[in-house]
Curated annotation (Swiss-Prot):
Naturally occurring in which organism (per UniProt): Homo sapiens (Human)
Classification lineage: Eukaryota, Metazoa, Chordata, Craniata, Vertebrata
Protein name: NAD-dependent protein deacetylase sirtuin-2
Effect upon mutating S368E: Abolishes CDK2-dependent phosphorylation
Outcome of substituting S53A: Reduces deacetylase activity
EC code: 2.3.1.286, 2.3.1.-
Superkingdom: Eukaryota
Catalytic activity annotation: N(6)-acetyl-L-lysyl-[protein] + NAD(+) + H2O = 2''-O-acetyl-ADP-D-ribose + nicotinamide + L-lysyl-[protein]; N(6)-tetradecanoyl-L-lysyl-[protein] + NAD(+) + H2O = 2''-O-tetradecanoyl-ADP-D-ribose + nicotinamide + L-lysyl-[protein]; N(6)-hexadecanoyl-L-lysyl-[protein] + NAD(+) + H2O = 2''-O-hexadecanoyl-ADP-D-ribose + nicotinamide + L-lysyl-[protein]
Assembly and binders: Interacts with CDC20, FOXO3 and FZR1. Associates with microtubules in primary cortical mature neurons. Homotrimer. Isoform 1 and isoform 2 interact (via both phosphorylated, unphosphorylated, active or inactive forms) with HDAC6; the interaction is necessary for the complex to interact with alpha-tubulin, suggesting that these proteins belong to a large complex that deacetylates the cytoskeleton. Interacts with FOXO1; the interaction is disrupted upon serum-starvation or oxidative stress, leading to increased level of acetylated FOXO1 and induction of autophagy.
Tissue: Isoform 1 is expressed in heart, liver and skeletal muscle, weakly expressed in the cortex. Isoform 2 is strongly expressed in the cortex, weakly expressed in heart and liver. Weakly expressed in several malignancies including breast, liver, brain, kidney and prostate cancers compared to normal tissues. Weakly expressed in glioma cell lines compared to normal brain tissues (at protein level). Widely expressed. Highly expressed in heart, brain and skeletal muscle, while it is weakly expressed in placenta and lung.
Annotated S-S bridges: none
Residues bearing PTM Phosphoserine: S23, S25, S27, S53, S100, S207, S368, S372
Binding residue positions for NAD(+): 85-89, 95-97, 167-170, 262-263, 286-288, 324
Compositionally biased residues, Low complexity: 361-370
Amino acid sequence: MAEPDPSHPLETQAGKVQEAQDSDSDSEGGAAGGEADMDFLRNLFSQTLSLGSQKERLLDELTLEGVARYMQSERCRRVICLVGAGISTSAGIPDFRSPSTGLYDNLEKYHLPYPEAIFEISYFKKHPEPFFALAKELYPGQFKPTICHYFMRLLKDKGLLLRCYTQNIDTLERIAGLEQEDLVEAHGTFYTSHCVSASCRHEYPLSWMKEKIFSEVTPKCEDCQSLVKPDIVFFGESLPARFFSCMQSDFLKVDLLLVMGTSLQVQPFASLISKAPLSTPRLLINKEKAGQSDPFLGMIMGLGGGMDFDSKKAYRDVAWLGECDQGCLALAELLGWKKELEDLVRREHASIDAQSGAGVPNPSTSASPKKSPPPAKDEARTTEREKPQ
């Protein structure tokens, strides 16, 4: 189950940070939100007054080959991955916005007032049944991680992964071998659940929630009989405090941003691309170009630092356009990791099949050798703001 889009598209970074502060000013989340608000102001001045780090071109060319050579150099030791629903679609999990196949286009049977209601906290508290029916269809544990997930696992194994910031709630990063310390699950997770009552907040494990969902029993707290909700971020809820606290330190020392499978439309997650030092290279692996901001809006609203793939001033951003799995295979081949990656996927999928008793590989995530496409060129490709991931 992929990202639940926990803020409306028209919300700005500042508005979301303020929401995080207002939600609980005495909590860790409130403190983290305050730090994020200061970071927002610092970012605004940095973008408008050219303060902070200097622009230095670290890529010898703005291609996938250039990124691979940089990754093999001593300059690249810490990689941050920013990922969205597009890295899980090959596992059989729908994204949210793709026409006809996206989740929002396939919710008619739940008789919602509008598609987004299924992830609104106010609607959930009154009508939890649609969400739990959907959760049964897309429950974590029914899918296997993709090549993208295992590419991030390779980064971890090789000591290159600083952090993975994920918008997804499908827990596939964990199944692939990333640990709690490796992850910032920006939109929450199914891994734990809590009673929605503010006076109770009893915690329940994944196994408890799974049993309730698959028995088609609306989960109720054993202590107070209030609803129990997975710890995913609904519309109307603040992002986890960990998102803001990790952001403060991680982006000061990152050497490469690897952005995969996201349209970068949802704030404040989308603003993460602007948090890195001005010299830090950024690679986008996605079906469409994303993250290209309007310079005027960036200056006025503090959302600067957008991707620049095509202008004469471009110096650090590279777009590889296509399926995320194929992009990771292409990059792995350039790094000399392709066989290692394919072997890892085969081995891990076989282990998952053995544990589940299935014994039959899932064709949607099979890592059978495929001819990697040539690295995508940087031809212009129009991306509208509302295009799907």
